[in-house]
Amino acid sequence: AACCEKESLPVTPTSSDLQFGHLAKTWDEGIPLGNATVGTLVWQRDSVLRFSLDRTDLWDLRPMDSIAGPNNRFAWVCEQVRKGDYLPVQKKFDHPYNALPAPSKIPGAALEFPLNIGKVSSVHLFLNNALCEVLWENGTKLQTFVHADEPVGWFVFENLLDTVSPEIIAPRYSNPDEIAGDNSHAGPALGRLGYKQG
């Protein structure tokens, strides 16, 4: 949800708050907000403000033969390591996953704000309020948070000189160029699941 309130949301600073002089440039360093169901990372991708959105229940849970059966135990993996023969473990888990990475976490979407308002002067995560506040040198302020119990979040801009239209960005479900050279479980495995780009 978006708000256009004139007044700032109340915050209570603490000595444990996270404070930075700029927005993170990568998703994994973004300001985390969330609850047990939904979450977001607040960061800057290229020149846009980006909220990486996710849900804990977005999974591809199609059955995989490789993780079924009696050898689907950590004790079995440890036994192979003790024997000095890790190849059976790779054949059972890694090789099938490289072909079809399921079960797999599916990422949510992103919300991007194409703001041309200059340089960020501060980023503050108020831990007591679970609220992120971003200030720009021109006086623009963003406050955003995720509700503690409900699967919903809010953002409020103040002193925004022009209207801004956020854009919803779907995950890249298919990108053959990335898939061909990827051999990491954290990489673009989503493309190997066979979903059509929406």
Show which residues each predicted segment covers.
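C-terminal motif of bacterial Sec signal peptides marking the signal peptidase cleavage site
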Residues: 2-3
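Aromatic-residue-lined binding/catalytic grooves and analogous aromatic/hydrophobic interfacial grooves
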Residues: 8-198
